[in-house]
């Protein structure tokens, strides 16, 4: 079983807040796939379904953000799950709006919901961070995260949620980089390039020698010129 947790604060007052983008993302997955109606358990709203042939439990903790780990930890203990069975979706101040990042483990970055989950569930779970941008100064952070998205934000929120919901089965299969590419394409950004493989080192060969093609004339076999070319290209006598 995979637990997909969206973080946010319960209640209509917070429904449209930037801090609730995790709830919104999980709602999008719920709408797109054949999940059960929301029910109350583990001090959360939960819904069961399948993605990619695997059982999935969607969770929206109702404990308020700072105590999210209590709810998620309760669910993990009930189902006897490990941190590797957990994906948490939440807002990220340090990412620009319309950007997303997915990784395993790491710090809480000052996010109280993640701090709580780290304390109750361990740290080696997957974290899907959805950028909401930074207001620029620390004094404005609280009003920013607890403020509602603007109408103009729909231009990137809708394609973000659509891409996540359409490709949610990639979370189950562990296809993290592919999912990030799908989201980046939906948002008009660049896809993530695979890391280049390190070049193999060739022992005792000059880069000049490696660049030569096979149509070049053969080196002379003897004489002063032959000796000089042997030293340049590393050719040894038979």
Curated annotation (Swiss-Prot):
TRNA binds at residues 14, 64, 66, 112. GO terms for molecular function: peptidyl-tRNA hydrolase activity; tRNA binding. Residues 190-225 are annotated as: Disordered. It is found in: Cytoplasm. It comes from the Bacteria. Its EC number is 3.1.1.29. One of its GO terms (cellular component) is cytoplasm. Keywords: Cytoplasm, Hydrolase, RNA-binding, tRNA-binding. The record marks 9 as: Discriminates between blocked and unblocked aminoacyl-tRNA. NCBIfam families: pth. This is Peptidyl-tRNA hydrolase. The gene is pth.
């Amino acid at each position: 079983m995979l637990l997909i947790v969206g973080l946010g604060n319960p209640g209509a007052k917070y429904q449209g807040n930037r801090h609730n983008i995790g709830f919104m993302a999980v709602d999008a997955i719920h709408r797109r796939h054949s999940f059960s109606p929301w029910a109350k358990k583990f001090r959360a709203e939960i819904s069961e379904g399948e993605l990619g042939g695997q059982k999935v439990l969607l969770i929206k903790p109702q404990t308020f953000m700072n105590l999210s780990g209590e709810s998620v930890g309760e669910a993990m203990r009930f189902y006897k799950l490990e941190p590797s069975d957990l994906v948490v979706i939440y807002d990220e101040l340090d990412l620009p709006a319309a950007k997303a990042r997915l990784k395993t483990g790491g710090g809480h970055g000052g996010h109280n919901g993640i701090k709580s989950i780290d304390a109750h569930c361990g740290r080696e779970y997957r974290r899907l961070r959805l950028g909401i941008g930074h207001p620029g100064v620390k004094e404005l952070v609280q009003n920013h995260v607890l403020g509602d998205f603007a109408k103009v934000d729909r231009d990137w929120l809708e394609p973000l949620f659509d891409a996540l919901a359409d490709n949610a089965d990639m979370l189950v299969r562990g296809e993290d980089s592919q999912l990030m590419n799908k989201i980046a394409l939906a948002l008009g950004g660049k896809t993530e390039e695979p890391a280049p493989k390190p070049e193999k080192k060739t022992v005792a060969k000059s880069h000049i020698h490696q660049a030569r093609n096979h149509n070049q004339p053969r080196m002379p076999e003897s004489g002063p010129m032959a000796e000089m070319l042997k030293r340049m290209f590393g050719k040894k006598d038979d």
